[in-house]
């Protein structure tokens, strides 16, 4: 049976202490009181499950698909017909400025200490609680930068704490690092969950993700190389622990994303399980018979040729006139991710793509024509944390450390990370080599003519590897943010993100192509968003979200000050 689908509902029923019930002199008979609940490890485990749907969303539920595929399109990978845009105004309320999950984690950590368990169990569950607190604070810092830090359950009358000023993001992330270090030391190495519960490797995997983000943010935004090195070392160490565990390996690329069951998949550290009639999603449907937001020309051109060279210098590249040429002799991950034998054009196909290039990374062909392959009935399992990400986290952290004066990136580093990805069964792309600090393939040093001149050549190739390996998995916007490269999503300065496949209308006689805009009239590259104002990046304030007005007013009304983010 499924492990945690309904646990959030169970926890809501059990966590009575979020409600006011002081008016009752006699404890309620139909539910636990706080004092009675925290008596067994089983109850602790049940409470912990309440965190899972919030942090391990997978493909979401119903008519959603989480951050996968087009769940996050404000980046340079997608060519939507109506492009997502940066926040333009300070919200009146909401906006993600909430500390409810911090409070929940602090309550959990506090109560675990009171449960009659042995010390190993107390330390394990404390580590689990500190993982969730760390993840929540990472999310808050990611969105807002400086935030008030709380590591204890607060009284509702302690205004000096409730309305405290924002703490510096470095102070907060140092606390988050302490949480992850404790969790890595104390969370159990093995739990009988087959990838459905938090264990030490899950902690380490998230640690590599969180501190790769924060280390690069400190480098590119805060100009703090010492703190950048500390966090990047933490990311590298965590990834290396997972690698050295020997517990994970790579199999078929696409099976990680379109399988009815991920149980036993050697690449998956943590996944969310789906079952018809219990918990389903709609991601498979939007890779199946529905119109979809397609990948940009820029994204398609980021895939290497099969000789391991960028298309701008590879003799293997056949050009972009026709899908057969675009897809010839490419990094095989392009075939695992995108439909390679046809363009899907608006006016020709009912399941058209806005760019002509269609995605099938998440499509399970076995259920494509069954009821569960359509609508919001999709039961394919969702990877939450996978080994492929851990490998590229290791490579990027190591390469970034080298730019900060750390140890040089070695061939051994590449062979235990990037080249494991390239030697995945069914991929078999030539190894990436480092020669004199520069990228090389088969002994040939090269420099991509499309490289951003601000980015060193080797780091450019590792970032490319990350983009390709994690394509459409919801990472790209945060990657551009932490690298301080949001200019890549500017449709004026980077028009190829608002371009799709090359099309000649004469190739589609009788088709109604009136909704198809092309760069050269009756032929040219598809323009997914031909009308309206193009998306631009013209203000660095959007690297952080604004704090909602109601929170600033609330602080002021209580006699305190909550500072707004710069530029808002």
Please provide the spans of the model-predicted regions:
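Conserved, well-structured interaction surfaces
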Residues: 41-57, 75-144, 160-174, 178-195, ...
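Alpha-helical scaffold segments in carbohydrate-active enzymes
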Residues: 50-54, 128-140, 182, 206-213, ...
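Amphipathic alpha-helical protein-interaction segments enriched in hydrophobic
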Residues: 196-210, 382-390, 475-481, 485
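An aromatic- and glycine-enriched ligand-binding surface/loop that stacks and positions planar moieties
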Residues: 20-79, 147, 181-182, 197-354, ...
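Bacterial Sec-dependent N-terminal signal peptides
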Residues: 1-29
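Acidic, serine/threonine/proline-rich low-complexity intrinsically disordered regions
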Residues: 153-154, 162-166, 205, 218-236, ...
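Short coil/turn linking the two alpha-helices of tandem helical-hairpin repeats
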Residues: 141-142, 146-148, 191, 213-222, ...
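Long, intrinsically disordered, low-complexity segments
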Residues: 19-20, 98-101, 175, 260-309, ...
């Amino acid at each position: 049976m499924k492990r945690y689908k309904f646990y959030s509902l169970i926890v809501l029923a059990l966590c009575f202490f979020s409600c006011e019930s002081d008016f009752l002199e006699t404890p309620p008979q139909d539910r636990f009181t706080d004092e009675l609940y925290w008596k067994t490890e089983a109850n602790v485990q049940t409470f912990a499950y309440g965190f899972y749907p919030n942090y391990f969303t997978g493909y979401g539920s119903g008519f959603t698909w989480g951050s996968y595929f087009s769940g996050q399109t404000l980046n340079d990978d997608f060519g939507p017909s109506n492009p997502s845009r940066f926040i333009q105004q300070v919200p009146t309320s909401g906006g993600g400025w909430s500390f409810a999950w911090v409070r929940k984690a602090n309550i959990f950590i506090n109560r675990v200490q009171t449960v009659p368990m042995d010390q190993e169990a107390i330390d394990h569950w404390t580590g689990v609680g500190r993982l969730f607190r760390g993840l929540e604070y990472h999310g808050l810092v990611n969105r807002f930068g400086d935030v008030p830090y709380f590591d204890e359950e607060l009284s509702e009358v302690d205004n000096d704490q409730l309305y405290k000023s924002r703490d510096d993001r470095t102070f907060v992330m140092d606390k988050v690092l302490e949480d992850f270090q404790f969790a890595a030391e104390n969370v159990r190495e093995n739990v009988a969950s087959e990838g459905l519960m938090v264990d030490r490797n899950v902690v380490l995997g998230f640690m590599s993700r969180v501190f790769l983000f924060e280390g690069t943010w400190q480098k590119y935004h805060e100009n703090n190389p010492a703190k950048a090195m500390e966090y990047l070392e933490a990311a590298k160490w965590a990834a290396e622990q997972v690698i050295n565990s020997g517990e994970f390996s790579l199999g078929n690329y696409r099976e990680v994303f379109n399988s009815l069951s991920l149980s036993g998949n050697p690449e998956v550290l943590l996944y969310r399980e789906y079952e018809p009639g219990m918990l389903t999603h709609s991601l498979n449907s939007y890779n199946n018979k529905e119109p979809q937001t397609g990948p940009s020309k820029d994204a398609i051109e980021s895939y290497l040729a099969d000789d391991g060279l960028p298309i701008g210098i590879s003799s293997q590249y056949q050009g972009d006139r026709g899908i057969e040429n675009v897809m010839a002799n490419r990094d095989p991950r392009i075939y695992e991710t995108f439909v390679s034998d046809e363009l899907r054009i608006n006016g020709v196909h009912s399941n058209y793509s806005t760019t002509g290039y269609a995605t099938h990374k998440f499509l399970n062909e076995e259920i494509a024509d069954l009821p569960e392959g359509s609508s919001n009935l999709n039961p394919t399992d969702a990877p939450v944390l996978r080994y492929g990400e851990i490998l590229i986290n290791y490579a990027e952290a190591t390469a970034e450390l080298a730019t900060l004066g750390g140890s040089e990136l070695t061939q051994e580093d590449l062979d235990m990370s990037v080249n494991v990805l390239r030697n995945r069964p069914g991929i078999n792309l030539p190894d990436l080599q480092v020669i004199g600090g520069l990228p090389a393939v088969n002994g040939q040093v090269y420099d991509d003519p499309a490289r951003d001149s601000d980015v060193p050549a080797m780091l450019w190739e590792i970032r490319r590897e990350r983009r390709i390996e994690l394509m459409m998995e919801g990472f790209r916007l945060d990657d551009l943010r932490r690298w301080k490269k949001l200019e890549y999503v500017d449709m004026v300065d980077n028009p190829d993100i608002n371009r799709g496949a090359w099309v000649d209308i004469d190739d589609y006689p009788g088709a109604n192509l009136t909704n198809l805009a092309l760069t050269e009239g009756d032929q040219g590259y598809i323009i997914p968003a031909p009308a309206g104002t193009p998306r631009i990046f013209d203000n660095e304030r959007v690297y952080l979200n604004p704090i909602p007005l109601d929170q600033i007013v609330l602080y002021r009304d209580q006699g305190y000050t909550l500072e707004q983010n710069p530029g808002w």
